[in-house]
Regions:
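Outer membrane beta-barrel transmembrane domains
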Residues: 154-157, 247-350
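Hydrophobic lipid-interacting interfaces of membrane-associated proteins
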Residues: 181, 233, 284-286
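Solvent-exposed flexible segments
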Residues: 208, 222-235
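Solvent-exposed loop segments that connect transmembrane elements
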Residues: 240-244
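Outer membrane beta-barrel translocator domains of Type V secretion systems
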Residues: 34-216, 327-330, 334-343, 347
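Extracellular/surface-exposed low-complexity segments
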Residues: 1-55
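Surface-exposed loop/turn motifs in large extracellular/passenger domains
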Residues: 170, 200, 221-223, 274
Length: 350
């Protein structure tokens, strides 16, 4: 509504000012450039240490009953005698989880027994039983809060071995085993009620190697044994709902893993009690997957895909029917991964 010079009123319609051309096209020559502003990334969420305890339990169950041929004692046992054996082992592992936010320290104890049920010439078939326990402590590097995890497991399995040479001191060998395990798991945070859930695994392993006699003396010999082992683990865990409503499911772990190494050992040729020392070096290649989902968010353990192992120990032959062995091993990997273990075993021919 506009009043003109004669005092008359009338309506006027007109366009307003257009948009700023520098807003429409900042590249125009008359426009002053504006420095871009980097987007602000939200800080990573602070996680409860209980998440690391669930992941530690999963890792412990996967590796508790991992089995190699030499875990059943020395190959150098000629004849058609069947053998019964037993071994105890203990290990300590340190690794991180969820991008290094959580520190995991765990110990595992194992008892495994077995016996040949069929032995003929260069081949044997047997059964084995195992029982183990793992305890872990998880501390948040951000808050300092902690949680604990525990796994109790049992396993049953079968194994079979064939060697080109009857006493296993020359030529090729093939070893295989199948195992089935069940685990009772427990997780507890500070001031919280314990959480219980079940898991299970099925594993298959195939190992092969070749033994070379590199030195022969009058009463002893030295051997080099390259080894290759492939293993597959199918791991399953029950869907679990915590008392606070958190849902833990979609366990993704296990899969195919491999081991490539060499074992150097001495072997006495004299009768009676004989000590046979050995050294071993291994490259361990894992599946690289160890995750769980917490309310739909996937979290993982920082267990390296590549690990490197050193072994040392000795086997003691006690006459014709008894033998014992013991050894230690150290594994190292990225992200501060460390695993130190040892075992003792006893073997009897019958």
């Amino acid at each position: 509504l506009v009043k003109d010079a004669n005092g008359n009123w009338y309506l006027r319609s007109q366009t307003g000012a257009g948009p700023d051309p520098c807003v429409v096209d900042p590249s125009l020559p008359e426009c002053v450039p504006i420095d871009p502003v980097d987007p602000v990334e939200p800080p990573p969420p602070v996680l409860r240490p209980e998440a690391g305890a669930y992941l530690a339990n999963q890792s412990a169950a996967l590796n508790m009953f991992a089995h190699r041929m030499h875990d059943r004692g020395p190959m150098t046992a000629p004849g058609d005698d069947r053998h019964a054996w037993a071994r105890v082992g203990r290990g300590n592992v340190d690794f991180s989880a969820v991008g290094g936010q959580l520190a995991v320290d765990g110990t595992t104890s194992l008892l495994q027994i077995g016996s040949d049920v069929l032995r003929t010439g260069n081949a044997s078939v047997g059964v084995m039983l195992g029982s183990g326990r793992a305890d872990s402590s998880v501390v948040s590097r951000v808050t300092g809060y902690s949680a604990k995890g525990r796994v109790r497991g049992t396993a049953v399995g079968v194994y079979g071995t064939w060697s080109q040479d009857a006493d296993g001191t020359q030529g090729a060998y093939i070893d295989a085993n199948l195992q089935f395990g069940r685990f009772d798991n427990r997780v507890q945070g500070i001031g919280l009620e314990p959480e219980h859930y079940d898991s299970r695994m099925a594993s298959a392993s195939l190992e092969t190697g070749y033994t070379f006699n590199v030195w022969q003396g009058t009463a002893s010999a030295l051997y080099v044994q390259p080894q290759l082992q492939l293993s597959h683990v199918d791991f399953r865990a029950d869907r679990h709902v915590e008392s606070n409503g958190t849902v833990i499911d979609h366990a993704d772990a296990g899969g195919l893993s491999g081991r490539l190494g060499v074992r150097v050992f001495g072997h006495g040729t004299a009768a009676g009690n004989t000590v046979q020392p050995y050294l071993g070096v291994n490259w361990l290649r894992g599946s690289g997957t160890s995750t769980l989902q917490f309310n739909g968010d996937t979290l993982g353990a920082d267990v390296p895909r590549n690990r490197y192992e050193m072994q040392a120990g000795a086997e003691l032959k006690l006459g014709q029917r008894w033998g014992t062995w013991g050894g230690v091993s150290v594994q190292r990997g990225d992200h501060g991964y460390r695993n130190v273990g040892g075992q003792l075993g006893l073997r009897m021919a019958w």
